[in-house]
Amino acid sequence: MGDNRKVRVVVGGVFDILHVGHVHFLKMAKELGDELIVIVAHDETVKRRKGRPPINPAEDRAELLKSIRYVDDVVIGEPGEISIDLIKRLKPDVIALGPDQDFSCEELKKRLRKEGINAEVIRLPYLYKSDRAKTSKIIQRIIETFCE
Protein backbone atom coordinates (compact mmCIF):
# COMPACT_ATOMS: atom_id res chain seq x y z
CA MET A 1 0.00 0.00 0.00
CA GLY A 2 1.38 3.44 -0.96
CA ASP A 3 2.08 6.35 1.34
CA ASN A 4 -0.92 8.69 1.22
CA ARG A 5 0.69 11.34 3.40
CA LYS A 6 0.51 14.83 1.95
CA VAL A 7 3.66 16.90 1.59
CA ARG A 8 3.20 19.98 3.75
CA VAL A 9 4.92 23.22 2.75
CA VAL A 10 5.18 26.13 5.18
CA VAL A 11 6.04 29.72 4.30
CA GLY A 12 6.09 32.83 6.42
CA GLY A 13 6.02 36.53 5.79
CA VAL A 14 4.41 39.87 6.41
CA PHE A 15 2.18 39.94 3.31
CA ASP A 16 1.18 43.54 3.92
CA ILE A 17 -0.44 45.12 0.86
CA LEU A 18 -0.71 41.93 -1.17
CA HIS A 19 0.81 42.19 -4.63
CA VAL A 20 1.65 40.03 -7.62
CA GLY A 21 5.06 39.08 -6.19
CA HIS A 22 3.32 37.50 -3.20
CA VAL A 23 1.01 35.54 -5.50
CA HIS A 24 3.94 34.22 -7.55
CA PHE A 25 5.77 33.24 -4.35
CA LEU A 26 2.74 31.39 -2.97
CA LYS A 27 2.17 29.59 -6.27
CA MET A 28 5.81 28.43 -6.39
CA ALA A 29 5.63 27.29 -2.77
CA LYS A 30 2.42 25.33 -3.39
CA GLU A 31 4.10 23.53 -6.30
CA LEU A 32 6.60 22.06 -3.81
CA GLY A 33 3.94 19.93 -2.12
CA ASP A 34 0.29 19.12 -1.60
CA GLU A 35 -0.59 21.51 1.20
CA LEU A 36 0.55 25.11 1.74
CA ILE A 37 0.36 26.72 5.16
CA VAL A 38 1.22 30.39 5.52
CA ILE A 39 2.48 31.93 8.76
CA VAL A 40 1.58 35.62 8.78
CA ALA A 41 3.91 37.80 10.83
CA HIS A 42 2.43 39.10 14.07
CA ASP A 43 1.94 42.88 14.14
CA GLU A 44 4.58 43.27 16.87
CA THR A 45 7.08 41.33 14.79
CA VAL A 46 6.45 43.57 11.78
CA LYS A 47 6.91 46.69 13.88
CA ARG A 48 10.20 45.42 15.32
CA ARG A 49 11.65 44.10 12.03
CA LYS A 50 10.53 46.89 9.70
CA GLY A 51 10.56 49.83 12.11
CA ARG A 52 6.91 50.60 11.40
CA PRO A 53 3.59 48.96 12.12
CA PRO A 54 1.95 47.02 9.30
CA ILE A 55 -0.56 48.86 7.13
CA ASN A 56 -3.06 46.04 7.66
CA PRO A 57 -3.45 44.12 10.94
CA ALA A 58 -2.46 40.45 11.02
CA GLU A 59 -6.08 39.28 11.10
CA ASP A 60 -6.85 41.13 7.85
CA ARG A 61 -3.67 39.91 6.17
CA ALA A 62 -4.55 36.34 7.19
CA GLU A 63 -8.08 36.64 5.81
CA LEU A 64 -6.80 37.95 2.48
CA LEU A 65 -4.27 35.12 2.21
CA LYS A 66 -6.96 32.52 2.94
CA SER A 67 -8.78 33.70 -0.18
CA ILE A 68 -5.84 32.82 -2.46
CA ARG A 69 -6.35 29.47 -4.15
CA TYR A 70 -2.80 28.22 -3.53
CA VAL A 71 -3.14 28.64 0.24
CA ASP A 72 -4.66 25.81 2.29
CA ASP A 73 -4.37 27.37 5.74
CA VAL A 74 -3.08 30.50 7.44
CA VAL A 75 -1.87 30.99 11.00
CA ILE A 76 -0.74 34.19 12.68
CA GLY A 77 2.77 33.90 14.05
CA GLU A 78 3.81 34.67 17.58
CA PRO A 79 5.56 37.93 18.46
CA GLY A 80 9.31 37.69 18.02
CA GLU A 81 11.51 35.54 15.84
CA ILE A 82 10.57 32.23 14.23
CA SER A 83 8.68 30.13 16.78
CA ILE A 84 10.12 26.63 16.90
CA ASP A 85 7.04 25.50 18.85
CA LEU A 86 4.78 26.72 16.04
CA ILE A 87 6.93 24.97 13.42
CA LYS A 88 6.75 21.75 15.47
CA ARG A 89 2.95 22.01 15.61
CA LEU A 90 2.70 22.58 11.85
CA LYS A 91 4.96 19.59 11.04
CA PRO A 92 6.29 20.85 7.70
CA ASP A 93 8.08 18.68 5.18
CA VAL A 94 9.37 21.78 3.40
CA ILE A 95 9.95 25.33 4.60
CA ALA A 96 10.21 27.73 1.68
CA LEU A 97 11.87 31.10 2.21
CA GLY A 98 11.14 34.06 -0.01
CA PRO A 99 13.91 35.63 -2.06
CA ASP A 100 13.94 38.77 0.08
CA GLN A 101 13.80 37.10 3.50
CA ASP A 102 17.01 37.62 5.43
CA PHE A 103 17.26 34.16 6.97
CA SER A 104 20.13 31.84 6.11
CA CYS A 105 18.79 28.50 4.86
CA GLU A 106 21.72 26.67 6.43
CA GLU A 107 21.41 28.41 9.80
CA LEU A 108 17.66 27.78 9.91
CA LYS A 109 18.21 24.14 8.94
CA LYS A 110 20.77 23.70 11.75
CA ARG A 111 18.43 25.30 14.28
CA LEU A 112 15.55 23.07 13.20
CA ARG A 113 17.70 19.90 13.29
CA LYS A 114 18.72 20.69 16.87
CA GLU A 115 14.99 20.72 17.70
CA GLY A 116 14.32 17.45 15.88
CA ILE A 117 12.62 19.06 12.88
CA ASN A 118 13.83 17.51 9.62
CA ALA A 119 12.05 19.74 7.13
CA GLU A 120 13.82 20.65 3.92
CA VAL A 121 14.61 24.39 3.84
CA ILE A 122 14.82 26.06 0.46
CA ARG A 123 14.90 29.60 -0.87
CA LEU A 124 12.61 30.40 -3.77
CA PRO A 125 13.90 32.75 -6.48
CA TYR A 126 12.35 35.99 -7.67
CA LEU A 127 9.99 35.25 -10.52
CA TYR A 128 8.63 38.74 -10.78
CA LYS A 129 11.32 41.40 -10.51
CA SER A 130 9.57 44.71 -10.54
CA ASP A 131 8.86 47.70 -8.37
CA ARG A 132 5.24 46.63 -8.67
CA ALA A 133 6.10 43.59 -6.54
CA LYS A 134 7.71 45.32 -3.56
CA THR A 135 5.52 46.63 -0.76
CA SER A 136 7.91 49.48 0.08
CA LYS A 137 7.84 50.67 -3.54
CA ILE A 138 4.04 50.46 -3.63
CA ILE A 139 3.83 52.58 -0.46
CA GLN A 140 6.27 55.07 -2.00
CA ARG A 141 4.16 55.34 -5.17
CA ILE A 142 1.00 55.90 -3.11
CA ILE A 143 2.69 58.72 -1.18
CA GLU A 144 4.07 60.32 -4.35
CA THR A 145 0.73 60.05 -6.14
CA PHE A 146 -1.67 61.11 -3.41
CA CYS A 147 0.32 63.09 -0.85
CA GLU A 148 2.49 65.45 -2.85
Swiss-Prot record:
Associated pathway: Cofactor biosynthesis; FAD biosynthesis; FAD from FMN: step 1/1
Coiled coil: none
EC number in record: 2.7.7.2
Keyword terms, alphabetized: ATP-binding, FAD, Flavoprotein, FMN, Nucleotide-binding, Nucleotidyltransferase, Transferase
Main enzyme class: transferase
Binding site for ATP: 14-15, 19-22, 100
Gene Ontology biological process terms, A to Z: FAD biosynthetic process; FMN metabolic process
SUPFAM superfamilies (UniProt xref): Nucleotidylyl transferase
Reactions catalysed according to its record: FMN + ATP + H(+) = FAD + diphosphate
Cofactor: a divalent metal cation
MF terms in GO: ATP binding; FMN adenylyltransferase activity
Self-association and partners: Homodimer.
Similarity remark: Belongs to the archaeal FAD synthase family.
Function in brief: Catalyzes the transfer of the AMP portion of ATP to flavin mononucleotide (FMN) to produce flavin adenine dinucleotide (FAD) coenzyme.
Protein name per Swiss-Prot or TrEMBL: FAD synthase
This protein's encoding gene: ribL
